[in-house]
């Protein structure tokens, strides 16, 4: 975000997402509270955000029709008017790109597992949150694990290889 501000971005769009994409992998699909509302934290703690218009609407990404309507209202009120048809097309393109990205992540996870098994390497799954890549709060655990000879993979890169576990507790987050 600081980089965007330094580059003179007029608008920064960082929505709040109470629910993450429903992957049907758990009892519910609540987003981690920190991830869901990280933009609220940034708004309250980054004075530099006053240099741009920081947009952080609450969005339901699991209903594209409602998402488009909500974005239309929000954009009309805060940025300018956009045709609903354009917003729907942008949402569809965004989800298509997300699917392509996730297919690449899964392929890389499979490639890493194959490499580790073929070369007798230990495998470490780093289960984290998106904000862990923030250099201001990252701890370098991935680099430490690699320096110790582990092949590291993210949970997103291999979760498709396992069946969901049904347990006797309510699994809130996926």
Regions found by a protein language model. Name each.
Residues 1-174:
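An N-terminal assembly and electron-transfer interface module characteristic of large anaerobic redox
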């Amino acid at each position: 975000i600081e980089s965007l501000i330094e580059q003179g971005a007029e608008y920064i769009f960082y929505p709040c997402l109470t629910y993450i994409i429903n992957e049907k992998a758990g009892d519910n699909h609540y987003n981690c509270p920190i991830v869901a509302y990280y933009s609220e934290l940034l708004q309250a703690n980054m004075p530099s955000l006053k240099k741009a218009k920081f947009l952080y609407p609450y969005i339901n990404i699991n209903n594209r029709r409602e998402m488009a309507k909500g974005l239309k209202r929000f954009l009309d009120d805060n940025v300018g008017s956009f045709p609903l048809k354009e917003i729907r097309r942008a949402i569809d393109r965004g989800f298509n790109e997300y699917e392509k990205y996730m297919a690449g992540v899964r392929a890389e996870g499979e490639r890493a597992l194959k490499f580790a098994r073929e070369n007798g390497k230990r495998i470490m799954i780093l289960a984290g949150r998106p904000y862990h890549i923030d250099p201001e709060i990252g701890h370098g655990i991935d680099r430490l694990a690699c320096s110790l000879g582990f092949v590291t993979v993210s949970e997103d890169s291999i979760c498709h290889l396992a069946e969901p576990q049904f347990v006797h507790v309510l699994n809130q987050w996926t």
